[in-house]
Amino acid sequence: MRQYVQVPTVEQEKAYDYNSAFEPRPCMCLGVCCCCAALRPRYKRLVDNIFPEDPKDGLVKADMEKLTFYAVSAPEKLDRIGAYLAERLSRDVVRHRYGYVLIAMEALDQLLMACHSQSIKPFVESFLRMVAKLLESGEPELQVLGTNSFVKFANIEEDTPSYHRRYDFFVSRFSAMCHSCDHDPEIQTEIRIAGIRGIQGVVRKTVNDELRATIWEPQHMDKIVPSLLFNMQKIEDID
């Protein structure tokens, strides 16, 4: 006669015990994060490396040299470098992290001076958008910073000038700066001088790019001439 052995109830429950609170090991998540960081495009990693942890330390020169070498060696990446720098700068302007804004513009100035290839045109468009962002800010320091960068750009002779590029915004903005009414006399003077320098830069750049017909159009002259005469009158009043 067959004999059956009954399995204890406790053992049955134990055999099918399921731990619903099971979670993956943290180290696996960290590994995935590390992989994601490694997959970031090289140009983004090179750009990120030029920014120190403390903006007071200034531009990381060794990493800036690497970024410049990469940009010169791979000019087709210039537009992406410019777009990414513009993204970072816009974010830092909104967050009032002006130390990093200064570093970004210094990097842009160096890249403009180093690169003169056909591929620089898309990069210049990103650069001009960033300059416009600074000029539109209500911070005199950023307005002067943007003007200085634009003047440096105006002194650069591009290998192939862009005939479709227009500077309407900059004519209007620099002309408005010439009429600054800041309550602080020193800041007011600083902004007005920056406006005059900006107008000079626009004229120089349009002449170099053979866009003379554009700059002499009435809609531009109606802003430039009164702005210059206004400041000349102020100088005479002081004298």
Tell me what each language-model feature is.
Residues 19-24, 52-68, 81-88, 97-112, ...:
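HEAT-repeat alpha-solenoid elements in large eukaryotic scaffold proteins
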Residues 28-36, 67-78, 93-97, 115-124, ...:
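HEAT/armadillo-like alpha-solenoid scaffolds in large eukaryotic assembly and transport factors
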Residues 42, 46, 84, 173, ...:
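Charge-rich, solvent-exposed alpha-helical interaction surfaces
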Residues 48, 90, 109, 131-132:
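Amphipathic alpha-helical repeat scaffolds
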Residues 151, 175, 200, 226-229, ...:
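A broadly conserved amphipathic alpha-helix scaffold signal in soluble, globular proteins
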